[in-house]
Amino acid sequence: MAAQAAGKYHLVIVESATKADKIQNYLGDGYIVTASIGHIRDLPSGAADVPAKYKKEKWAHTGVNVDDDFTPLYVVNPDRKAKVRELKELLKDADELILATDPDREGEAIAWHLLEVLKPKVPVKRMVFHEITPEAINDAITNTRDLDLDLVEAQEARRIVDRLYGYEVSPVLWRKVMPRLSAGRVQSVATRMIVERERERMAFVSAGYWDLTAQLSAPDRASDTHAVTTFPAKLVEVNGQRIAQGRDFDDKGQLKSGKATQNVMVLDEAGAHSLAEALQGLQGGAGQGLAVTSVEEKPYTRRPYAPFMTSTLQQDAANKLHFSSDRTMRIAQKLYENGYITYMRTDSTTLSTAGINAARQQVREFFGEEYLYPSVRQYNRKVKNAQEAHEAIRPAGDHFASPDSLKTVLGPEEFKLYQLIWQRTLASQMADVKGTTMTVRLEGTAPTAPATPVALTASGRTITFPGFLKVYGAGFSNERGDDRGNDAESGKNVHLPQLAEGDTAAVTSATPEGHITNPPARYTEASLVKAMEELGIGRPSTYASIIRTINDRGYVVKRGSALVPSWVAFAVVGLMERGFERLVDYNYTSDMEDELDAIAEGKENRSRWLSAFYFGADDAALQKSVPGKGGLKGLIEQNLESLDAREINSLHLFDDENGVPVYVRVGRYGPYLERTIKSDTAAPVVERANIPDAVTPDELTREKAEELFAVPSEGRKLGRHPETGYEILVKDGRYGPYVQEVLPEEDPGKPKTASLFKSMDAKTVTLDEAVRLLSPVSYTHLTLPTNRE
């Protein structure tokens, strides 16, 4: 509880205790700063929270009375009742209430709820700030405003829609797929994105192709002595035909059709090795080398990226620091609350005048005038649904603390994130990277029978001025979010000798290399945030929580940094696509964000919009808001009975070599494979096989399916336990291979089981090893294979 001041005072309420302590120091006497610790009330989280007089209402389970203008039922959270009493006590002796919650919709809503619960009889002001520094707090306390009720209505509409969506659609998942699943306005769309990417991977057919790289040597005209320099070059043409590269193949493993591939040659392994051997005959000398036929030199310029907004901070922290989105936001919250950075939930790339001046001053101070861009750089957003209500994320204040000055003040993770933000902010006002790029084409005739005309190209880049890379170079993010490498300049700074048309080069070696085209990369947290941002789905403040939710619900698992969908996710997305198509449509979800923004701006009526969403509407102007015939209510009524649960949970993979359909069935106890074998002489036989959790959807090929079907469902018998006499089996389960004892039918007990070590193989594990695994004593004495890979 905040310290009691003598006499009257101004009561300031913020959201966190850390902020309260910091701001109390800045405001001093005459103010009491205390914390609400987030929301003090919300919609009921369960039946136990619903007041007795509402429990029998048909809308009580959602907490929203859809028949009374979508009136929400707000209840004070049980763990906030003591806090409410404390705030009311402090308010008794206050002569003014200042609501200083976060500067966004959520913060505006928290302020409104405080007003509704505390019912102050003194003047009320809204205080807004984007950084916690003495200057920012003094400015905010001087320039207060009224509560923005349009923002409050927009947040309430968003909360009601999310509650109706989740509480009405989730029970359909429970009945049709399995219990304890959930649907959500943004989480279901994010899950669909991940599932669609996996579908693309499953349908992808790889193509194989070869190319070769030669090492060439030639005199360097830039050298006073014309010293011979060695450099790499790639084979690009044979007999006038361009050598195929990965970009020339489609997702079915075939060369793309069109002009671009009309004169393309797919080099196979034999051809590549033959050409490599022939090229090594071009050792130089009269007519025995490669002639330079063109030299193209161009200036190279690279501009810095914009300062961080929430999404790009999450992406860069993932790519450079290997932080999850959730971890990044937790650390950023600490930095903000302790006054080190500006507000971290923003979709703006704009710096304030103070931020620009501070960044430019430190560029001069640390790197010199030549590294400062001559004029102020301005950055405009090009992403759907950007609000740009706040400044970009930057170090706080009008003079930034250097990372070195905070090394002993911040924890290791906080220091790393602060340094990243500081570097990015300074880089945004620095000079461009300057350099040159050079492409050299060389032609010759390989000594084959018959002779083969060939062409090679060598490319290189020279950085003549590092510009912003001086501060933001190491591990420089490509910001694609696709994990293709962190250093944007790596592999490109190849030094080429100065050459001119007519010069010759000798081949010193030639190395063929085989390649296979790859399916689209799975989403990582960074690339998912990037894709959601580009589609206009969700808001900066929601990305981390959405990713956390789909992980917690079991819709995705992480393999390294990649997000892999579970088979349950496939079933859930399939159900949503069949019965609630618009609710997982990317454009519809993005349009909802626009409409919620319109409510925040006072351009759309909250009640009219909610009614169109839930009940449907005939008004053409509202059709974008309607998720289907009869609105959400109509969709639930149509689909609760009509959707076929078995069909929803049956995913056709492919037909086996005999033309028999193979399905993945999503069962209550996990996914499994199933096919029905028919014969002329016997009844159909249904074959089933567990799908181990370690097998991802795109790895479940025909070959893998046959391997799983071949594992006996009853397991392989290893023999009998020497002490109990019970049969011991080795079986393959969804969590991997394990051994199990078989109890007599009359024994009601639970059989002992034990997982195999990763170094063990279910096909070769012995009875002795199984007995030791099942032993209740430590089995550290168990002799294991030496290769533990």
Language-model regions: role of each:
Residues A2-A3, G7-Y9, D21-K22, D29, ...:
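Basic, low-complexity terminal or inter-domain segments flanking catalytic cores
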Residues V195-V266, K320:
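C-terminal helical "lid" subdomain and adjoining coupling/linker elements of P-loop NTPases
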Residues V205-S223, F231, S294-S325, I331, ...:
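C-terminal accessory/connector segments of nucleic-acid motor ATPases
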Residues A17-A20, G30, T34-I37, N77-L91, ...:
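Amphipathic alpha-helical transducer elements in NTP-driven molecular machines
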Residues F249-A306, A500-D503, E513:
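Metal- or metallocofactor-binding catalytic centers and their adjacent structured scaffolds
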Residues A136-T213:
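C-terminal or mid-to-C-terminal helical accessory/interaction module adjacent to the motor/catalytic core
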Residues M1-R159, E168, L173, F249, ...:
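Intrinsically disordered, low-complexity regulatory segments
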